Amino acid sequence: MYFDQSELLPADILVGRNEAPDASKARGIRSVLGSWSNHNALIVRSAEHGGYAVGDTTPPRAMVVSLHHYEDLVNAGTYKVRIYRVRDLSMDERLRISLKWYELSYGRHYSDYTLLQLALFRFVNHLPFRLPIRGTWCSENTVRPFTAILPDDRNPIRKPDPPFLLKKNVTPRTYANRLECGILEDVTERTNRNDK
């Protein structure tokens, strides 16, 4: 598998599923959340990586990794990747969100959350405040630049109906729910190629 960079756009959302034999935490995340995926990241512009790269939040800190990093994981058979796209964003908004990731998300300390905390997120997911957690996690750090650039009624973590309240404790399940209600579009068939 390789990413077709002509089909990727800045601010696309990478949705990952770690299936490595030693990925017990990833399996736990999926199980607790009832989610296909256990990881989220943002497609960002990167001159260093020749076009696009992945704004990735993993221990110990958020960093930029090449698309090849995820291609290698998929091709080794230990990872699955889907690409979700926020509907109705202009290219200017996409570029601003991509740049804002560097400003707001890059270098942030990864959270030391536990599966118990994730279970709490799932079952009290309508809390009107963010649960107190040191650091940030991948899903939260992925949406941070969207929240800075877009009004609430266009934010990908908004509830689908007015008054478009934002989800305060974002998890991989949040992105799956927004896909189901049409806020996000799955563009994997266009972006992920196997014909090399």
Name each region found by the language model:
Residues 2-7, 32:
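Short, surface-exposed secondary-structure edge patches
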Residues 10-12:
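Loop/turn positions that initiate beta-strands
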Residues 15-89, 126-127:
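Glycine-rich catalytic cores of cysteine/serine-nucleophile enzymes that process amide/ester linkages
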Residues 41, 102-103, 142:
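Residue-level preference for non-acidic, small/hydrophobic
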Residues 75-80, 91-122:
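A structural motif
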Residues 118-196:
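Activation targets extended, charge/polar-rich intrinsically disordered C-terminal tails
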